[in-house]
UniProtKB/Swiss-Prot annotation:
It comes from Oryza sativa subsp. japonica. This is Succinate dehydrogenase subunit 7, mitochondrial. Residues 1-41 form a transit peptide. The keyword NAD does not apply. Keywords: Membrane, Mitochondrion, Mitochondrion inner membrane, Transit peptide, Tricarboxylic acid cycle. Component of complex II composed of eight subunits in plants: four classical SDH subunits SDH1, SDH2, SDH3 and SDH4 (a flavoprotein (FP), an iron-sulfur protein (IP), and a cytochrome b composed of a large and a small subunit.), as well as four subunits unknown in mitochondria from bacteria and heterotrophic eukaryotes. The lineage of its organism: Eukaryota, Viridiplantae, Streptophyta, Embryophyta, Tracheophyta. Pathway: Carbohydrate metabolism; tricarboxylic acid cycle. The gene is SDH7. The keyword Membrane applies. Its main location: mitochondrion. It is found in: Mitochondrion inner membrane. It comes from the Eukaryota.
Length: 90
């Protein structure tokens, strides 16, 4: 039984590997290894700047406010669940 031409062409196309497009630059791993020493500009950028000292990070206070907010949310949810159960039982 003879196969139609389009089936044989389809099979050969499926068997042959597709050419892959080059990877995008932002998806490639960095070329710079971790063992390479930092340059002078990078070292200068990483140094502590005294002019920026007054704009200190408020990271710890933000964490504390977040924890308090999470606790209050839990208390409100517990109170709502308690009210629902109390109304269902009465």
């Amino acid at each position: 039984m003879a196969q139609p031409a389009f089936l044989s062409a389809l099979r050969s196309r499926l068997r042959s590997p597709q050419p892959q497009a080059p990877a995008l630059p932002h998806l490639q791993p960095p070329r710079r290894g971790f063992h390479v020493e930092l340059g002078a500009r990078e070292k200068a950028l990483l140094e502590e700047d005294t002019a920026l000292k007054r704009f200190k990070s408020y990271k710890n206070s933000v964490k504390q406010v977040s924890k308090v907010g999470n606790i209050l949310t839990g208390v409100v949810l517990f109170a709502c669940a308690y009210e629902i159960v109390a109304l269902a039982n009465s």
